[in-house]
């Protein structure tokens, strides 16, 4: 099974202005080619599956990250030259974005690809309105995430899901031989990851209905911290949080979570608990229940279907 790295790409836009006569025409280098869609002439089973998925769901379907691999000529020695375009799931148009890279193991059996599509249609897509569906899905067997600093790649995690601007990648090796319970649990985790990212990307004004309740505490130290699990969680609950602050997988006492972590915690709560369950569990912490209701409404407004 081949492994591929998706590297962080530096995107530079270069604009050259030259004088043109009325007879001059402008033509892009490879006009009107949709790299996410299988070609109209493709008749193999994988291409047919991809195209059918797009027409049925509105999202493109990929099974590897290579969008383009075409010969563009030869060099002086006669060696073929290729133009390559890779899908960079982690690419974000922001200079301060955390740099990450992903290593994929591809699905190689058509039956596994079909199973992945069935999983999407059965457990994921029914919950996602048009605004929440990604531009494309990249279905693979396994994902390994790396952080990148000064061109040094450090192992980070093996996520089930990687959410990007142009694609959401899903690792489906866990589905091999899985029963309905495992399918549902896997789908729940994927939906939490996907929706946490979608919510965090919303404008501050839209998020304010949720963030206003704990905004003054985000990523700040507790005024009078406690250094045991129970007392630390009391500090969190009193400020409207349902989890503590973690860094590199370790819990830090006396520090409040970040906004993004708070969003992820409440997205999970909104997707997995009923109002009655939350009201009972956090009966002494009305701010938590209010934030739960605000998050459910946010998700509904974005098009989530409970």
State what each model feature region is:
Residues 1-6:
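Positively charged n-region of N-terminal signal peptides that target proteins for export
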Residues 10-13:
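Hydrophobic helical h-region of N-terminal Sec-dependent signal peptides
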Residues 15-19:
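C-terminal motif of bacterial Sec signal peptides marking the signal peptidase cleavage site
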Residues 21-117, 281-306:
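Acidic/polar, low-complexity intrinsically disordered N-terminal segments immediately downstream
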Residues 110-165:
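Auxiliary, metal-adjacent structural segments of Zn-dependent hydrolase domains
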Residues 150-181, 283-305:
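Structured domain cores in non-transmembrane regions
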Residues 167-216:
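Active-site recognition of the HExxH zinc-binding catalytic motif
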Residues 216-306:
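Metalloprotease/metallohydrolase-associated module, dominated by Zn2+-dependent proteases
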């Amino acid at each position: 099974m081949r492994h591929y790295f998706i590297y962080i790409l530096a995107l530079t836009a270069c604009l050259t202005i030259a004088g043109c006569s009325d007879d001059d025409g402008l033509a892009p280098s490879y006009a009107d080619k949709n790299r996410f869609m299988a070609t109209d002439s493709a008749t193999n089973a994988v291409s047919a599956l991809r195209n059918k998925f797009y027409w049925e769901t509105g999202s493109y379907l990929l099974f590897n990250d290579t969008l383009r691999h075409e010969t563009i000529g030869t060099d002086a020695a006669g060696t073929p030259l290729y133009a390559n375009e890779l899908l960079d799931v982690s690419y974000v148009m922001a200079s301060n974005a955390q740099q990450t890279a992903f290593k994929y193991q591809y699905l190689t059996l058509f039956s596994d690809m079909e199973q992945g599509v069935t999983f999407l249609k059965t457990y994921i897509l029914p919950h996602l309105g048009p605004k929440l569906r990604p531009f494309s899905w990249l279905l693979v067997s396994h994902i390994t995430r790396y952080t990148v600093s000064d061109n040094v790649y450090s192992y980070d995690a093996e996520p089930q899901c990687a959410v990007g601007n142009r694609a959401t990648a899903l690792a489906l090796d866990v589905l091999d031989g899985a029963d309905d319970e495992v399918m549902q649990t896997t789908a729940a985790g994927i939906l939490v990851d996907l929706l946490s990212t979608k919510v965090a990307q919303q404008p501050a004004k839209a998020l304010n209905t949720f963030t206003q309740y704990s905004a003054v505490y985000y990523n700040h130290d507790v005024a009078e911290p406690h250094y045991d699990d129970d007392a630390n969680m009391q500090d969190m609950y009193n400020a409207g949080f349902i989890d503590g602050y973690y860094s590199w997988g370790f819990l830090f006492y006396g520090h409040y979570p970040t906004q993004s972590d708070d969003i992820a915690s409440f997205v999970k709560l909104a997707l997995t608990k009923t109002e009655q369950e939350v009201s009972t569990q956090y009966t002494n912490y009305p701010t938590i229940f209010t934030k739960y209701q605000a998050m459910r409404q946010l998700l509904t407004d974005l098009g989530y279907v409970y």
